[in-house]
Amino acid sequence: VMRLSDNPVLSTVSWFYIWLFRGTPVLVQLLLWFNLALFFPTLGAGPLSVDTNDLIKPFVAALLALALNEAAYMAEVVRAGILAVDEGQTEAAHALGMSQGQTMRRIVLPQAMRVIIPPTGNETITMLKTTSLVLVVGAGDLLTRTSAIAAREFTTIEMLLVASVWYLVLTSVASYGQYHLERRFARGTSAGSQASVGRRILANLRPGRVEGGVR
């Protein structure tokens, strides 16, 4: 939303943030956060200062790296969704006396969600798989646990397959949720009123049905 601001300071800051985090590899960001103590041994000032190594644990480093990187991508997804809504509707809402916040909540966002949800689902699935990178800092994710078992039991291939199955389960659950969210926000539109491909195929395979719908 800051990218759409008329304030040049806000729009510039948001542009720089998105440019920086989208333009550098996630693994590099992860390693920089994990080794932050090399640049800043302590954080804070005076009696409020804390040792960076005590604060930036592997889990915290992974959380910061993945969250900030994903936020940069999602910022562009949300911006695209808002821009997809006809500007005339915003002007009409303002003409009816709605404030900027009311227009965003009641007019813009409900329509923008139809554009936002599909790429958000894709980003969620990508993020689930990207968590495997935290193996390099030992943050205790799924791949870290399976790799530890593989090293102990000498079952590298087997544990990689187990991890792959779990990733498939997680991404399938995310895809299922995305599908139902898309259907919910597509109600009342041409996309929401269309029957699914499977239902149309089943309808065409009913006994006695011929071309044109005439027996």
Kindly give the residue locations of the regions a language model identified.
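Transmembrane alpha-helices and adjacent helix-loop boundaries
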Residues: V1-R215
